[in-house]
Amino acid sequence: MACSLIVGLGRSGVGAARLLHAQGHQVVVLERDEGPEQQSKAQQLRDQGIQTELGCPLEFSSFQRWLDDVEQVVISPGIPWDHPTLMELRDHGVTVRGEMAVAWQALSDCPWIGITGTNGKTTVTHLLHHVLSQAGLHAPMAGNVGHSAAELGLQCMDPARSKPDWIVMEMSSYQIESAKEIRPTIGIWTTLTPDHLERHGSMDAYRDIKKGLLQRSDHAVLNADDADLKSRQAHWPDAQWVSSAQTNHEPFNLELWVNPEGFVCNKKGALFPANALAMPGEHNRQNMLLVTAAALQAGLEPQAIERGLRSFPGVPHRLENLGSLHGMHVFNDSKATNYDAAAVALQAVPGPIALLAGGLSKQGDASGWLQLLHDRVCSITLFGSDRNILLGLIRDSGYTGDVTSHPSMTDAVTAAIAQGKKGNASSLLLSPACASFDQYKDFEARGNHFRDMIQQLSRK
């Protein structure tokens, strides 16, 4: 019997294994590590009848015993699409797919809304899911938001569950490049700035991956306020564009904009006040317009959209308001894993700002972020493995505020609070501008740690 080989015991690998097993496939999971966590996960899958092999590195030799029977190899988003082992498998005629492709196969009879972009996609995903759900639609979200797309596919196999009206799927560039068969009914592109270049090699390659998803969508919704997308408007003659910039109308076939009186408008007139979404920042106004355009396309009335926007509680780790401490507003923006996302946060919160930044640095243009440090930040506290890289950038920029550096975020938070009090900061902001993998499992774990620390300090 042909088998499906699943690479890795991460969230996506486990989800793909369980879904394919439920569909009747013979499944074998291969995992490199053999630690206690992997042992526990492996046993859970074995208890479900899924063969799991530990100590299998991502090398061609790990796959050879199954080559005659393999139907497909399913990889997690963290594995580069051009990994030498995957290329060798393809040379032997093996189909290599991402977990998202497995989910699409299970869920393609439901209309998808595919959401991508360098920054903003998680907020748009959560907000659109909320708006559609508040309007009475069954619109589960999954993908790059902490819930495996394959696990959603497995849930939807349950005959006791109603079929989704819409699937709201956040899709990273990693997930898109390994699932080119996905064709959303609605595609949303939030922003494009340099990110993941160490993986994709160039900005053009990164852009082309995201562009592919929108080209395969029946309806494309794009952000006219993004410089990169705006510069390529000729590529999208049939797209729906949105803009929060009141002077940005002429070059675009704008579907939605904000008028000088502060109302969201389309060609029929004003729909509702733009302040229906309480989240701070111009970027969140853009997110709100993208969600509104998609919700209108999905058949919602403006009144229903406004109700959903007004009741939205926000997104963890995205400018998450943690209250106040020593007279400072405290914000958890752990999701800001690059300079552009961190720059957005620096523009959104009240200044002067006591900033916490650091982690595992990424390639990218730091100039805009550095300028905002000069303009809005009274003190900077760095942490993590690449704190000295950031320190060098900050010093070279001529920044004159206080800068301190600590190995761990635990020590950094204590120092940042002291620096913020000293500098009369209005906001204490965790916006790392770096990935989290040097010290944390993911940005959620980093943000949860920060939130826990602030809550403990608030109780003292």
Give the ranges of each region predicted by the language model.
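N-terminal leader/targeting and accessory segments in enzymes
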Residues: 1-98, 102, 300, 457
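Phosphate-binding loop of NTP-binding sites
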Residues: 3, 22, 62-68, 77-224, ...
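Nucleotide phosphate-binding/pyrophosphate-handling subdomain across enzymes
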Residues: 3, 15-23, 272-378
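Residue-level signal for inorganic ion chemistry
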Residues: 20, 73, 115, 144, ...
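Short internal beta-strands
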Residues: 26-34, 222-224, 356-357, 376-385
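Short beta-strand "acidic-cap" motif of Rossmann-like dinucleotide-binding folds
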Residues: 27-31, 140-141, 168, 241, ...
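Beta-strand->loop->alpha-helix junctions that form or flank phosphate-binding loops
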Residues: 31, 53-56, 97-102, 142-143, ...
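C-terminal helical cap/extension that packs against the catalytic core
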Residues: 41-48, 367-426
